[in-house]
Amino acid sequence: MIFQQTLGNKATFSGIGLHTGKTITLTLRPAEAGTGIVFHRVDLSPAVSIEAHASNVVNTRLSTTIGRGDASVSTIEHLMAALYGCGIDNAHVDIDGPEVPIMDGSAAPFVAAIAKAGVKMSGKARKYLVVKKPVTVVDGDKKATIIPSRHYKISFDMQFAHPAVKSQFRSLEFSQESFIGDFAAARTFGFLAEVEMMKSHGLALGGSLENAVVIGDNGVINPEGLRFQDEFVRHKILDSVGDLSLAGHRLIGHVKATKSGHDLNHKLVTELLKRPDCYTLIEFTPQAFNAPFNIGIPELSWLEA
């Protein structure tokens, strides 16, 4: 799809904030082409608007938080992944609290509501951020790299010293179908001992077996088990889609991540954006673009030079 898209109608959600434990209502509204994704803290007077962009990220501990002045919105990554995965470029997000509702811990409820609201195409072309040179960020044994590619792809290597998780690897070659079918329903997860510790420090107050996969000493304690055998790494990729969408444009490049998380995802986007020699922004015309949603671009032969 080469044209910017927004929602056909409004979509409203109410749910618990994972970390605050508060009930929050969020409404997605259509927006004009060129708007981007803009959050509005409508519970404040006056309301505060915050663009969903890497330059507005103020915290990456446990989730991704954007802010402006004293106002902020946290845990935006699942909603951002759903918007990106459903092809939504422009939307207003009215929210009456400091955190996006966790829903069931995945992006699936957001995806379903966006599908019900419908998608409206504009007449304005999208701009794609095409990676020209590799960019890498490292933090100890954690690493994230984005390299030139004909498609948007994320390859994730996850490693935990726990028998229920161990090592998991998976790749997503991005398309709307693959994201919605294989990744959107993957839930956030945590270790029981860590959840108890966080709650004692005023965090994860809304966490439960209804909105997260919880791992005990002997494995997953959720009665229904896992939705996918490798649900953990699928969720890490879902998080990455949401975090990387804060680049502000559709990406064309291959992300290779090892033990990455919200902080390293943000550092990768920030490092990429501050190195204009490593990417180019391209606005495609219908005549120049004849690929499906996964944005393979046969015209860009220079990527293989």
From Swiss-Prot:
GO molecular function per UniProt: metal ion binding; UDP-3-O-acyl-N-acetylglucosamine deacetylase activity
Known function: Catalyzes the hydrolysis of UDP-3-O-myristoyl-N-acetylglucosamine to form UDP-3-O-myristoylglucosamine and acetate, the committed step in lipid A biosynthesis.
Catalytic activity: a UDP-3-O-[(3R)-3-hydroxyacyl]-N-acetyl-alpha-D-glucosamine + H2O = a UDP-3-O-[(3R)-3-hydroxyacyl]-alpha-D-glucosamine + acetate
Reported cofactor(s): Zn(2+)
Family to which this protein belongs: Belongs to the LpxC family.
Pathway: Glycolipid biosynthesis; lipid IV(A) biosynthesis; lipid IV(A) from (3R)-3-hydroxytetradecanoyl-[acyl-carrier-protein] and UDP-N-acetyl-alpha-D-glucosamine: step 2/6
EC class (word): hydrolase
Listed InterPro entries: Ribosomal_Su5_D2-typ_SF, UDP-acyl_GlcNac_deAcase, UDP-acyl_GlcNac_deAcase_C, UDP-acyl_N-AcGlcN_deAcase_N
Catalytic residues as annotated in Swiss-Prot or TrEMBL: 262
Encoding gene (name): lpxC
Cross-referenced Gene3D superfamilies: lpxc deacetylase, domain 1, lpxc deacetylase, domain 2
Keywords: Hydrolase, Lipid A biosynthesis, Lipid biosynthesis, Lipid metabolism, Metal-binding, Zinc
Stated name of the protein: UDP-3-O-acyl-N-acetylglucosamine deacetylase
GO cellular component: membrane
Source organism of this protein record: Geobacter sp. (strain M21)
Lipid biosynthesis found in the keyword field: yes
Coiled coil: none
Binding site residues for Zn(2+): 78, 235, 239
Keyword Hydrolase tagged: yes
Disulphide connectivity of cysteines: none
GO biological process: lipid A biosynthetic process
EC number of this enzyme: 3.5.1.108
